[in-house]
Amino acid sequence: NYPTQDSTMDKTFANNL
């Protein structure tokens, strides 16, 4: 579960992985 404010950042990070 990702926080709303960090969702974009987390998705980008996950995409990098």
Swiss-Prot record:
Q: What is its EC number?
A: 1.11.1.7
Note whether Transit peptide occurs among the keywords: no
Q: Kindly state a single biological-process term from the GO annotations of this entry.
A: hydrogen peroxide catabolic process
Q: What class of enzyme is it?
A: oxidoreductase
**Catalytic reaction annotation:** 2 a phenolic donor + H2O2 = 2 a phenolic radical donor + 2 H2O
Q: Which cofactor does it need?
A: Ca(2+); heme b
* Top-level taxon in the UniProt lineage: Eukaryota
Keyword vocabulary terms for this entry: Calcium, Heme, Hydrogen peroxide, Iron, Metal-binding, Oxidoreductase, Peroxidase
Membrane-spanning parts = none
Give the cofactor binding note.
Answer: Binds 2 calcium ions per subunit.
Which molecular-function annotations from GO does this UniProt entry contain? lactoperoxidase activity; metal ion binding
The keyword Oxidoreductase is annotated on this UniProt entry: yes
Q: Which residues form the signal peptide?
A: none
Q: Outline what the protein does.
A: Removal of H(2)O(2), oxidation of toxic reductants, biosynthesis and degradation of lignin, suberization, auxin catabolism, response to environmental stresses such as wounding, pathogen attack and oxidative stress. These functions might be dependent on each isozyme/isoform in each plant tissue.
What family is this protein classified in?
A: Belongs to the peroxidase family. Classical plant (class III) peroxidase subfamily.
Per its record, how is this protein called by name? Peroxidase 7
The organism named in the record is Daucus carota
Q: According to the entry, what is the taxonomic lineage of the organism?
A: Eukaryota, Viridiplantae, Streptophyta, Embryophyta, Tracheophyta
